[in-house]
Amino acid sequence: MQWQNTANRFGVLARFLHWTSAAAFIAAYIVVYYVIWFMDDTSPESWPVLNIHWVLGLLVGFLVLPRLLWRMIGVQPDNPPGSALEHRLAHLAHWALYGLLIAMPLTGYLGTGAPTDFGLFSVTGFNETAPFAWISHSYGLSFEAFEVPIDAIHHFLGKWIAWSVVALHVLAALFHHWVRRDDVLTRMLPWSKSEQPTD
């Protein structure tokens, strides 16, 4: 089991962070659309379900820092064959995805005036923090006024930007796998051929 990345493959840690982030991101969407489609999102009955969305969103945010740190200090697999323009576009797309993984949880948290309960601990709502107290005192803003533009940004990112960036990421991986027939997708899969679990 290779924990660190190599020139040919992502290590266990990078793959764990990638797929955990992806699972939490997708699950957060499933939960919030369940609330939108099947519940009244303004009723107290929806809050425990929304709390799951908040937990998953913050989990995505918490995972960004170790992902970025590991990307910066660790070896990155070699670029697949392609033009310099393709490599620059791929690099830009990856950083756009990281930006999204920061912006979505951040705006979600800033616009949530309720604590997020993780079970063993809870994260205080932003409206109860010292930074918001400073913002409120300095600019005379109530939390209700503060959260309106923050929520608008969060919803815009969620409805229009997130799926576009994620779809581009997935389509690019499938393009490399099925059209280019290189190892861009397989080197991030949970197991390589040599790591397949045996009976």
Residue ranges with predicted function:
Residues M1-D199:
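Membrane-embedded alpha-helical bundles that constitute the cytochrome b-like, heme-associated redox core
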